[in-house]
């Protein structure tokens, strides 16, 4: 039976976006949506609005029921010019920082950006623990490829890497082969049972200046996007878990 969920939202004000009805914003889907469909909804970003991610979070909850022993964690390692010194996935930061000692500094930074109509991006780290072995396909449906696709579908996500990430560009083969941890829990596109580590890069919101002051525009989406990231990982891992289980169903004699 299909699962239906109704979410009522009264916390919206469409008139905040009236000034965008006749203009395109760089870095948004305004122009490309109109080019594709011949029309667009300018209110709050229309189909490309971050509000659509609520359905992903709801779906992620149901996916997590299939994976009761898998632990999904995420946190902000970089926000604008601020780099967290620690990588603590048990951080108590209300902003989602991996190092809660930077909370006050980040709050002050975001408030100053909000007042100036400025914005910033950053980096998020993800850890998936207790992922079953053998998930993913060897060629076209590699686990890292499907995770990358699902995570890059989140608005403003501009890059995804696994394990040592960008460090692979300068690591020698002899350095890489010493430890399978370098690959972040995925080898040859298939999970090896170790913790999966993912790095994501998010761009700054493109609406700045006076436009950012008039509508409902966040100076940074990172604190809000963490549940969405974890949900997309849950959905992808659940898909591959069910797929792998289908391979192991015993054929009748």
Locations of regions flagged by a protein language model:
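Glycine-rich, N-terminal phosphate-binding loop and its surrounding beta-alpha-beta segment
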Residues: 1-32
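Short acidic, glycine/tyrosine-flanked loop/strand segments centered on an H-E-D-like triad
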Residues: 21-47, 209-217, 221
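Glycine-rich, mobile lid/loop segments that gate access to catalytic sites or pores
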Residues: 35-139
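Alpha-helical support elements that line or immediately flank enzyme active sites
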Residues: 51-74, 145-149, 189, 194-202, ...
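Alpha/propeptide regions of enzymes that mature by internal proteolysis
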Residues: 53, 109, 146-148, 156, ...
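Flexible, glycine/charged-enriched surface loops at secondary-structure junctions
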Residues: 69-76, 113-124, 156-167, 244-253
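Glycine-rich anion/phosphate-binding loop at the beta-strand->alpha-helix junction
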Residues: 117-212
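Internal helix-turn-beta structural module
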Residues: 197-253
